[in-house]
């Protein structure tokens, strides 16, 4: 049996881009029109559960026999706060409810990163310029080589250990991501004085988080302060590693595409949708996996519809997959383990100044095809 040839960005016609855009817009419009009580009930339940896990965790960590359960409970609380609640609320998924506490303009999460900073680096830069090399800073976070088209430098030999460090301290790396520290330390296009000034509001939030977890709650524990300090440290570590792993598995498996800057010149709605499809990947799992990942297990659907409540992605996914099959586009998904393995293989490969993969030729083809596509559109 002959294998079906999948389309790439450059092989689609303007009419196909337009059709894909219309079909995905129809899904989005239908979902927006259907938002209502079940969505409000869902997010209220998530907030309630997150608070219950936090209270239970902080109490149990002060009781030696239940300390380990307390660490686990607080870890779940922090993951829910960041993934299923904070990330999604800050995308404006629940702004329509008119509740100040769940409005993207007001929400502040349990993270060293300020919500204001996150909405710049993530909501705007990453979601607008998804996987566009030179515009999406999430491609390596200024730290790693995550694209075949990034010029290799000796520092990238440390890709693997630096990725471990990034996972370990993820909340602090994203907190300072907007500083683009590599521009001062490596490329000398920013000064230390600029970095220091821009760091002030970030440090204010980081201090609050550090004081809460490592001073306030340990102090409340009295003689058990070391146990609470350690428990908070482990809960933050669990949240950091899990959040980073989820994000990496949605963006860096080997079959996920990256694009030259020319792709976004005169980009149509349909072309934007296709770029999101080709630049994202899902991983499979049950309901608990979806909740704990903030439904970023449906990273493709999230990039297509970032302002649709994430718990809806499971029902949207079959329609998106059908559209991909209809137009010959790959729908990239796999188990969490498979996506993790693929991601780390890519990280390892790109640490070396080795030959480039076949993806480069496709990206070059994209670049060459863009001008006539844009004119025809």
Q: Where do the language-model regions lie?
A:
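Short, intrinsically disordered terminal tails adjacent to the first/last structured region
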Residues: 1-8, 362-377
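Non-transmembrane, extramembrane segments of multi-pass ion/lipid transporters
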Residues: 27-37, 182-192, 258
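Extended hydrophobic/aromatic segments used for targeting, binding, or gating
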Residues: 218-219, 227-268, 353, 362-372
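Membrane-embedded catalytic scaffold of the fatty acid hydroxylase/desaturase
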Residues: 76-197, 264-354
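Feature representing long, continuous alpha-helical segments
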Residues: 213-217, 227-247, 271, 275, ...
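Alpha-helical bilayer-embedded segments of polytopic membrane proteins, i.e.
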Residues: 41-82, 156-172, 197-245
């Amino acid at each position: 049996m002959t294998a079906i040839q999948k389309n790439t960005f450059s092989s689609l016609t303007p009419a196909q881009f337009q059709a894909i855009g219309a079909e995905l817009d129809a899904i989005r419009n239908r979902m927006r029109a259907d938002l209502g009580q079940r969505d409000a009930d869902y997010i209220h339940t998530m907030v309630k559960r997150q608070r219950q896990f936090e209270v239970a965790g902080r109490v149990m960590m002060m009781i030696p026999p239940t300390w380990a359960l307390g660490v686990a409970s607080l870890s779940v609380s922090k993951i829910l706060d960041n993934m299923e609640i904070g990330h999604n609320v800050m995308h404006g998924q629940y702004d329509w409810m008119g509740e100040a506490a769940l409005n993207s303009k007001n929400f502040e999460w349990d993270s060293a990163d300020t919500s204001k900073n996150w909405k710049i680096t993530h909501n705007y830069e990453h979601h607008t310029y998804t996987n566009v090399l030179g515009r999406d800073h999430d491609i390596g976070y200024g730290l790693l080589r995550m694209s075949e088209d990034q010029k290799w430098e000796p520092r990238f030999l440390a890709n693997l250990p630096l990725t471990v460090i990034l996972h370990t301290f993820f909340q602090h790396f994203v907190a300072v991501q907007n500083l683009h520290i590599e521009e001062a330390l490596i490329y000398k296009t920013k000064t230390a004085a600029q970095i220091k000034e821009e760091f002030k509001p970030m440090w204010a939030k980081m201090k609050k988080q550090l004081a809460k977890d490592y001073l306030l709650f340990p102090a409340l524990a009295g003689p058990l302060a070391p146990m609470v300090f350690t428990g908070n440290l482990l809960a933050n570590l669990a949240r950091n590693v899990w959040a980073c792993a989820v994000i990496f598995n949605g963006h860096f498996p080997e079959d996920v595409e990256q694009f030259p800057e020319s792709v976004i010149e005169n980009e149509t709605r349909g072309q934007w949708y296709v770029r999101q499809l080709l630049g994202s990947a899902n991983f499979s799992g049950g309901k608990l996996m979806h909740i704990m990942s903030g439904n970023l297990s449906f990273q493709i659907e999230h990039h297509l519809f970032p302002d649709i409540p994430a718990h809806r992605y499971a029902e949207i996914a079959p329609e998106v997959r059908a559209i991909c099959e209809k137009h010959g586009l790959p729908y990239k998904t796999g188990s969490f383990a498979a996506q993790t393995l693929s991601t780390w293989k890519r990280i390892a490969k790109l640490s070396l100044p080795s030959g480039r993969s076949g993806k480069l030729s496709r990206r070059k083809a994209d670049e060459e095809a863009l001008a006539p596509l844009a004119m025809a559109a």
